[in-house]
């Protein structure tokens, strides 16, 4: 059975079990989702762990009875009468939103029914392996003005072996969770009460990690012919009216007044880059022009969807806008794809998924422009030998796009690079260049990011490596520990030498026991731990331990330096 149908059926059984145990609970919705399912309930009390165990037991009883899923068609009025009688207020609200004349319900054992499009399994006995996972709060329809419901998450698979493997992966994901590891490792924190939700504070180690990523970005962009620009974080509301963001994106924008004039905290960088493009007349000989910025943007996200570094209200992205001629378009797309693939490998991601989203029903621009841009995106992918999935009609209204999602160590997908054609902004800002015939011509505009949001990418890195970052990215690469105070001067001598070579070194000469200090360094995921005592002082060597591995033994300083340099180059 396909997993969507299986999980949807399991969600139905979950709702039936809850209604049998707590008849007063009101039903919300219960779809299948990626990796599982959920069901929302209106209940005064939150479900406890003991409640979840009871619900699982009741679900198993329903499954063991092998009750049939029976579909019935009702007209809209009949359905409203039925759910009014059952006092299922949220089902009535759903029916008010339905425009069709007919709706379907599913029954099991003539005891339980639910408003549902289906499909379902033929009977409950087809559900072989399931598990309830967690409880959370969720606003009805995701709106904070609506009642808060209680959401039960679960998952289901066709076999117990698949379920066991999935639960093992979930446990590993918890161990790697960047929301836990990030603060533990001293990378970042989010001070919800003091400063606000979704706003990231980088601690010293996190700031070093971010700067290393930024340095890589700047070096690689300049090497590839990009020009760096920087724009203000605020600008007049008029700019956003002209760009169209005010009409389409206002609810996600931070808007305020200064001296009776409206200003906006920028949610995107593109209008600012366009103003720089417009600052002088451009010739076809100047194109392509590639403006790049590590641009911080601010977007209002509802508190319910904020999630560590993955979904925040202020973030920085490696944002670039390319202005080119139609003839240059495919070449620019190909160059961006090369950049993305190389960057993924540099940071240790070897697998990714590519999606091409094409023209939606409602779009702006000329059909011929859409066809040309889509063809350029497709041909670039094919010429690089990259497999991709087409999402018909899923492009933005202003242009087709490529999305590249990286796969981490647990095979989870993370949104990363985007290459987006834009037919709207060049028209709104009346962009032009002088072509070979001396005529004003509209340039093609590409939005693109390589790593995307640096916050999200750092979250992905932490989880991919379970916090143990590769040596070149580690905020502290080496920590030196003298066994006693009398060996501290020798430890400082080694530190100074490694410092002078550009390595990131810490000295731990605290009075704690050596084992305790080593354990602390292991928890901090510091790649190399050096211990120095009398023997090391006499021989001018260091005792080397690699984090997560056994003692590597004694090395000369030259051997250690060579090893570190080679590992950084890898």
Residue ranges and their predicted role:
Residues 1-26, 32-570:
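NTP/phosphate- and nucleic-acid-binding module
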């Amino acid at each position: 059975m396909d997993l969507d149908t299986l999980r949807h059926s399991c969600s139905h059984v979950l709702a039936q079990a809850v209604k049998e145990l707590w008849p007063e609970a009101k039903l919300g919705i219960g779809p299948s989702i990626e990796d599982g399912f959920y069901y929302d309930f209106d209940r005064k009390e939150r479900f406890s762990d003991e409640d979840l165990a009871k619900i699982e037991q009741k679900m198993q009883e329903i499954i063991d009875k092998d009750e049939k899923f029976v579909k019935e068609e009702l007209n809209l009025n009949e359905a409203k009468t039925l759910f009014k009688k059952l006092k299922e207020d949220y089902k009535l609200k759903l029916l008010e939103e339905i425009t069709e004349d007919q709706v379907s319900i599913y029954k099991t054992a003539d005891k339980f029914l639910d408003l549902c499009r289906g499909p379902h399994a033929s009977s409950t006995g087809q559900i072989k392996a399931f598990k309830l996972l967690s409880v959370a709060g969720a606003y009805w329809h995701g709106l904070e003005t609506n009642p808060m419901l209680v959401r039960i998450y679960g998952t289901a698979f066709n076999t117990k072996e698949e379920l066991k493997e999935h639960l093992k992966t979930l446990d590993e994901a918890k161990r790697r969770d960047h929301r836990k590891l990030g603060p533990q490792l001293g990378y970042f924190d989010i001070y919800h009460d003091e400063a606000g939700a979704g706003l990231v504070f980088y601690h010293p180690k996190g700031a070093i990690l971010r700067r290393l990523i930024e340095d890589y970005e700047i070096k690689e962009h300049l090497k590839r012919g990009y020009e760096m620009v920087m724009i203000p974080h605020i600008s007049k509301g008029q700019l956003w009216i002209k760009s169209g963001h005010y009409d389409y994106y206002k609810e996600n924008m931070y808007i305020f007044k200064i001296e009776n004039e409206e200003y906006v905290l920028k949610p995107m960088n593109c209008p600012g880059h366009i103003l720089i493009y417009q600052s002088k007349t451009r010739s076809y000989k100047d194109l392509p022009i590639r403006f790049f910025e590590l641009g911080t943007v601010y977007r209002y996200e509802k508190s319910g969807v904020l999630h560590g570094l993955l979904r925040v209200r202020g973030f920085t992205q490696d944002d670039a806008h390319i202005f080119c001629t139609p003839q240059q378009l495919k070449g620019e797309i190909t160059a961006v794809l090369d950049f993305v693939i190389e960057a993924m490998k540099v940071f240790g991601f070897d697998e990714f998924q590519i999606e091409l989203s094409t023209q939606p029903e409602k779009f702006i621009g000329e059909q011929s422009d859409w066809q040309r841009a889509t063809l350029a995106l497709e041909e670039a992918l094919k010429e690089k030998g990259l497999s991709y999935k087409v999402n018909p009609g899923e492009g933005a209204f202003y242009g087709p796009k490529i999305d590249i999602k990286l796969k981490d160590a647990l095979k989870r997908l993370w949104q990363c690079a985007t290459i987006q054609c834009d037919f709207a902004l060049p028209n709104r800002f009346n962009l032009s260049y002088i072509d070979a015939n001396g005529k004003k011509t509209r340039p093609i505009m590409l939005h693109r990011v390589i790593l995307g949001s640096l916050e999200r990418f750092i979250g992905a890195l932490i989880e991919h490596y379970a916090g143990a970052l590769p040596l070149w990215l580690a905020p502290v690469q080496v920590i030196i520990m003298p066994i006693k105070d009398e060996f501290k001067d020798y430890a400082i001598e080694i530190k100074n030498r490694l410092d002078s070579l550009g390595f990131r070194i810490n000295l731990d000469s605290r009075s704690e026991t050596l084992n305790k200090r080593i354990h602390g360094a292991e928890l901090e995921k510091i790649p190399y731990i050096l211990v120095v005592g009398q023997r090391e002082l006499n021989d001018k060597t260091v005792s080397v331990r690699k984090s997560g591995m056994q003692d590597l033994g004694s090395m000369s300083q030259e051997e250690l330096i060579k090893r570190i340099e080679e590992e950084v180059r890898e």
